[in-house]
């Protein structure tokens, strides 16, 4: 991803996800790049967001990266946030594997599920 394009997408995501959130503790923040132990582009607790603004989608690679960076950050869920060409931020894609979706759903329902 071109650095300026990626930075713009990260900032647009942060701003969109923070709309209407007045609690500073709930706000999404952009992370500084940390190299080999990267913690993702966005701190959106309980998620780590990996922002992608690219022409060719590698969903498996994006999700694996998001999950790895969530583990590095010590948060439960990773999500790839993919820019959709010629569309607004809200029309982008939030992609996770089914295992993560299952865990998110269980948390929302307040039930336990085994960590796969």
PLM region descriptions:
Residues 1-116:
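Catalytic phosphate/metal-binding cores of nucleic-acid and nucleotide-processing enzymes, i.e., regions
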């Amino acid at each position: 991803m071109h650095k300026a394009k990626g930075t713009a997408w990260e900032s647009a995501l942060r701003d969109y996800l923070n709309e209407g959130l007045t609690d500073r503790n709930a706000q999404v923040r952009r992370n500084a790049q940390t190299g080999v132990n990267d913690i993702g582009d966005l701190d959106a607790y309980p998620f780590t967001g990996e922002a992608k603004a690219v022409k060719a989608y590698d969903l498996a690679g994006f999700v694996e990266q998001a999950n790895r960076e969530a583990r590095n950050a010590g948060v439960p869920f990773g999500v790839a946030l993919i820019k959709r060409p010629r569309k607004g931020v809200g029309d982008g894609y939030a992609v996770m594997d089914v295992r993560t979706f299952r865990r998110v759903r269980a948390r929302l329902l307040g039930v336990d599920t085994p960590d796969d």
